[in-house]
C-alpha cells in the first residue's frame, strides 16, 4: 500500500488555548496503491480536496491522525525529511503559473531532476516534454509566453521528469476548451497505460470523471 491515511484531520489555523481548531478535513481514512489506479477526487469547492492532496506529498503536514506515504509517516516533526516523498509523489497545481518559474521551457522542466540529483536532467526533461506533447520548437520559449494548455502540459512535464510513482493533478483540465481537455486526458491515459503509474486527479468535470476514472472519491465538507 503506497499511501495510507488513518483518522486524519487538518486545520489551517493554530488554535489558541480553549479554542477548538477549525478542521478542513475530518477523520479521513484512505488507501491508495502505487500502480494502476486512476482516481478522481470530487466534491464542492471548499470540501478539502486540494488540502488532502497536499498532505499526500508532504506539502502540508498534520499531527492529527496518521499519514503514511511509502512507509514514511508524515507529521509536523521538524526532523522528518520529505525530499524522497516529494520525488515519489509528484504534485501539479491547478494554476501552472504557480509552478513555472524559469526563463525557458527546457530549463524549467530540467530543474526537478537537477534538484533531486538525477543523472542527465536535460534528457529527462526532453523525454517528459515529449510525453506531454510539447514540440521541440518550444523548448527555448519562456513558459509564460505559452497558451494556457501548453503551460499546463509543461507543468505536468516538470512533475514527470523526476519519474514519480504517483502523479497528482489539481484540476488539470480547468479553463481548457473541449479539444484541449480531450488531448490532455488522452496524454494521461496513455501515460498510465505505458507506465502503470497511479494518477490522482481533482476534477469538477463529471463527464471526465465518468469516462476516465477507475475509482471515484467523493468529499463533502472534509
Q: Predicted segments — roles?
A:
Residues 65-76, 85:
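Conserved ABC transporter NBD signature motif
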Residues 167-170:
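Catalytic Walker B motif of ABC-type/P-loop ATPase nucleotide-binding domains
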Residues 120-137:
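Conserved ABC ATPase "signature" region
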Residues 57:
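Helix-to-loop junction immediately C-terminal to a conserved catalytic motif
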Residues 163:
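Conserved catalytic motifs of ABC-family nucleotide-binding domains
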Residues 142-146, 150:
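Conserved ABC ATPase signature
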Residues 203-204:
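H-loop/switch region of ABC-family ATPase nucleotide-binding domains
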